[in-house]
Amino acid sequence: MSEAHLPPTGSVEVVPEQTAVDLVEDVAREAEDPGIRTEPLLIALDIDGTIILEDETFSPGVVEAVAHAHRAGHEVMLATGRSWEGTEEFLASLNIAPEFVVTSNGAIILRKSDADVLAYERFHTETFDPIEVLTLLREHLPDAKYMVELADGRRLYTEHLGDWNLEHADRVPFEQLSSMPVCRIVVVSPGDTEQDFVELVERIGLNEVSYAVGWTAWLDIAPQGVDKGTALERVRSWLGIDPARVLVIGDGRNDVGMFRWALENGGRAVAMEQGPQEVRDAAGEVTTSVQAGGVAEVLRSL
């Protein structure tokens, strides 16, 4: 890349959009002082609605901003409700290889297994017996689509859904979903709204598990007491990072747990502007929307 060049003071130079982007990145990179070392942060980023848009392209500026944070010595990782199969590609695209990755809303923590390649292994898993929850939900949502994730990463599902990544997944009868302990249950009911799901879980009570309602009619259920925050506390401890040196960014109800964890420890919790009000209320700060590059804005300020 060519050396950053600014036009003389008082003049205006019109350049192509990509040239402008490259110029901003060059100037930002040159402004970084490698002689100034700060204590590293543990930065945990949600994926959907935080670093990527609905079409799974990256939020503006996020790739460059993650690189900026990495150059500053911070540990940038992902904490997502996705399975590992739906997460791996984003590590490669961001060009990061953190020591740990939190998936399945905290029920599975993966650890890097090879220093030279992007290879990870399941390091810690949480499971529960799904039979009571599945039976209860089926009574109220007989037409919903169900999927469970097992401790070894395999997934079992009842019906295909277009936006599900079904690598390492098998279609089975509903009764087979509860044949062994699971890390999580995913329920999708296209005929219901997000508010319908919120009201349903309040009405029937899901007291023996943790759960989060997605921005569509999507219910994600994990073992009791397990969320992104509990998983990140394990990661923080393993890495030996000060509890106050954490920064988490997300947009959904499944991010509230890690928001609370960060704030209770004196860290930072940042919600995306387009998230539900209850999510923004749970965070200590609100950045701009994913469409406007909210994550990049936060990371560039470090």
Locate the predicted segments by residue:
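Hydrophobic packing residues within well-ordered alpha-helices of enzyme cores
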Residues: 62, 87-91, 197, 201, ...
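Active-site phosphate-binding/coordination module
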Residues: 60-162
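Active-site metal-binding loops of divalent metal-dependent hydrolases
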Residues: 49, 82, 250-252
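Non-catalytic pre-domain segments flanking phosphatase-related domains
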Residues: 1-47, 71
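Mg2+-dependent phosphoryl-transfer enzymes with acidic/Ser/Thr/Gly-rich catalytic loops
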Residues: 16, 33-34, 38, 42, ...
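Short, structured coil segments at secondary-structure junctions
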Residues: 94-97, 105, 204-207, 264-265, ...
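Short active-site oxyanion
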Residues: 73-77, 97-99, 184, 244-246, ...
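Conserved acidic, metal-coordinating active-site core of Asp-based
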Residues: 140-249, 253-260
